[in-house]
Amino acid sequence: MYAGEFKQIGVTLNVRALKYSSKWYRWILPDLTWSIEEDEPRVYLTFDDGPHPEITPYVLDILDQHGFKASFFCIGDNVVKHPETYNEVLSRGHRVGNHTFNHLNGFQTNNSQYIDNVAKAAEVIDSTLFRPPYGRINDGQRGVVKKKYEIVMWDILTHDYSPRLNKSDCLQQITKLTKPGSIIVFHDSTKAQENLEYLLPKYCEFLAANKYISCQLP
């Protein structure tokens, strides 16, 4: 589970869980970026765990349909495996971020190994943005990473990776939570593919219909 995520008993993730699952984590880590102060109808779509040679291009095509830009937090190992897809993300005008080389859980990894893994990813991902996998990073790791990176979290986590997700309920809930400056997390990964292909087109249509645009993270 993601940091701060409530365990769900049933198959439906309710709006209260989506809204408050990271609230306590935001309270204890106010120095991380959870949303962007915005007066204009701008949001920040983000995608974790790619690049994937089939799913990432699908995402890029959906974004292009609406003229949206986004930020992709990439796993270094996937960049090495799929450099053409990674370069396509950049060539189509999107921003990238470091998501470690091997998708490490900071709560289960010693600090030295974690920092080395971030540095290994930096060899193939040129960025000043970092997002910890699962949202899990301890104090020691955070202190080192913050010297080189802005650590970007979220205020809307779609849970698209969950096989228990009720897709239609999730769509309704994430649209309710959307506000100017929201940072929204999707995943361009095999685990999330089915939910992503349902949610992303409809969510982008919602954004466009409500005069929102999606931009790269600043």
Predicted regions and their residues:
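N-terminal pre-catalytic segment of deacetylase/amide-hydrolase enzymes
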Residues: 1-45, 51-65, 81-82, 202-206, ...
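CE4/NodB-like, metal-dependent polysaccharide N-deacetylase domain
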Residues: 60-69, 94-95, 101-104, 111-139, ...
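Short, well-structured secondary-structure segments
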Residues: 44-47, 55-80, 87-90, 94-100, ...
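A cross-domain feature marking catalytic cores of carbohydrate-active enzymes
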Residues: 47-49, 74-76, 98-100, 132-134, ...
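Alpha-helical scaffolding within the catalytic cores
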Residues: 28-31, 57, 79-90, 132-142, ...
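His/Asp/Glu-enriched short active-site or ligand-binding loop at hydrolase and phosphoryl-transfer sites
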Residues: 6, 10-13, 136-175, 211-218
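Acidic-and-aromatic substrate-binding clefts and catalytic sites of carbohydrate-active enzymes
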Residues: 50-54, 73-82, 104-112, 131-138, ...
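Catalytic grooves of carbohydrate-active enzymes
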Residues: 174-218
